């Protein structure tokens, strides 16, 4: 629509009145001064200020922006020239952008309908493609050698708001037929770039393809964002005629002509915290069973796998990312992998992460390629120019990437994610494009063994079939086995039967992951935090008794807790925790040879040291502490030991604590009189007292020592598929891994107890497994 000069002048006066009325506040006049001082050429006008000045003007700007963009630019240009006449060259103008609330004109790419064509909208989404920045001619100057004169011509395309579009053909002769020579140095150009914006993955409709909108940015807005950025773009939604080669077509291509691009926070969809929420979070963080509580609250429909659930909680919390002054980047995100038999709920755990994590993208090994996970260089179908398209890991920046069926991925595609998992960047050097994109995300993968089911006669590395270069990039690697235990099978069957029998009061089915929401409005504060106990859903927890009614958090509160701890708590390492981490890492390295031969899942490398730091920091976040303490390191070692050895090494913790206590006591006694050095631990430091102490305590072995003995023996028998073993070999094996050594009489005493329980049979110094 071509607006006449009178209307243009009236619109310009309206914007001049708006800027003049601002003199008392000085907001926009100061903004114009800053713009002139910083040599910028765009002024951002807030819609709130425009509404306060004139509600009718704000509505007209949104409904018919083509009529008001040029007058607004002319008004700001006039004010800028009055402040500094030398600021703008002849023919230059100050551009105008808009920001602020747009009401129902604040939409996503899926909500852009034909009713928005010709109006100003604010579209939020994630940038998936960026074209190269190209110059667009605005004014051409031509020299005529015959007459010595010059001829200039201006160009406007369909995206311009001033006048009608002009042709794009350069004049080669003047009106008299004389040849013209183009003076390229005197021509005027402006930068031009096209973007593709997609709706954010977490808000896209399930089962539908994400919608995309093309965006045109010009002048100072080019290169203001890159693929993977979450942006909010304000612009005019226009319909461009299709390239039909002369035929009449009713199909139009829609684009968004941007006038303001602003980067959004990664946590734009962050939950809202109330004062009561913060109070309850602090109360939960002070509980002794916070780790178990969060682990049980994650995917309550999955029976068991408590240690894996705890590890998933730490993965969603993450460590602390560090960027040193020398350019070194220290990864803070935790990567995790699950390998095991089919039907052990690996994929269900990935779905639980998708439901809880603020930003999570799911993909599969067979349904994704290397460039689909990282980034790709594509060609634009219309212009033929190269574009950089972001992959799943770039789109999941500051989030979690869930990769199912990881073993089905090709080796070449799997190598593509090596850089992402450690350096957390995607570097592209193809087709004349060299770029580095951020991919700061955690990776949680699930895979089946190379033989379909886990072969216990082979080492974990041979079962997994993945190279060490990739395995070492995973902080945690869990072997999930389908155990043939009648008691466990009975408990699982009861749990699954309760899941299928569970229904609401009206007889309808109910989502298991959203229990507790219906009780949030009944006035009870606990109802909004803990899932209301249901015998059919939760069963009876014999270990916890009465506490079983409030041992699971609602999904809504769990999301709030994880988001709060992940983003607002940044713990730092203390000296005590650093020393404990160094000591623990040295012990893991010393036991590396035994781990490889005895069933260790991961190679113990320098990355394992960083894994301990990340897990400890994540545990400190979970406890809402700003310092990483020794208890956090011990909790991290529990998770790491379970991942490496597939058992709870409580005796390792006891050994570490006792060694630290013995070292501190020895240092203390070195400076004092050594008469009463170890009265309370006479059996540990003086070798002359070992036999005497053991002689009096052979028949009184503590229960925890008996359990540790049985655990070590059972693990050794299972790992080596033994049906009989000598007592001498048992004594050597147990003492090699135990926190404190067992003498011969204690070994025989524990074995006799196991024989009385019909678990083993002893004959002629040989123990036969029943």
Curated annotation (Swiss-Prot):
Alphabetical UniProt keywords: ATP-binding, Cell cycle, DNA replication, DNA-binding, Helicase, Hydrolase, Nucleotide-binding, Nucleus
Domain MCM, chain residue ranges per copy: 290-496
Transmembrane regions: none
Biased composition (Basic and acidic residues): 653-670
Classification via SMART domains: AAA (SM00382), MCM (SM00350)
PROSITE patterns named in the record: MCM_1 (PS00847), MCM_2 (PS50051)
Disordered: annotated span: 653-698
Main localization of the protein described in the UniProt heading: nucleus
InterPro entries from the UniProt entry: AAA+_ATPase, MCM, Mcm3, MCM_CS, MCM_dom, MCM_lid, MCM_N, MCM_OB
Gene Ontology terms, MF aspect: ATP binding; ATP hydrolysis activity; helicase activity; single-stranded DNA binding
Subcellular location(s) of the protein: Nucleus
First-tier enzyme category under EC: hydrolase
Domain of life, per lineage: Eukaryota
Residue numbers binding ATP: 340-347
Motif (Arginine finger): 472-475
Catalytic activity: ATP + H2O = ADP + phosphate + H(+)
Entry's Gene Ontology cellular component terms: chromatin; MCM complex; nucleus; THO complex
Biological process (GO), any one: mitotic DNA replication initiation
Enzyme Commission code(s) on record: 3.6.4.12
This protein's record includes keyword ATP-binding: yes
The protein's role, per its UniProt record: Probable component of the MCM2-7 complex (MCM complex) that may function as a DNA helicase and which is essential to undergo a single round of replication initiation and elongation per cell cycle in eukaryotic cells.
SUBUNIT field: Component of the minichromosome maintenance (MCM) complex, a heterotetramer composed of MCM2, MCM3, MCM4, MCM5, MCM6 and MCM7.
Family in the record: Belongs to the MCM family.
Protein's name in the database: DNA replication licensing factor MCM3
Organism, scientific name: Oryza sativa subsp. japonica (Rice)
Chain's gene name: MCM3
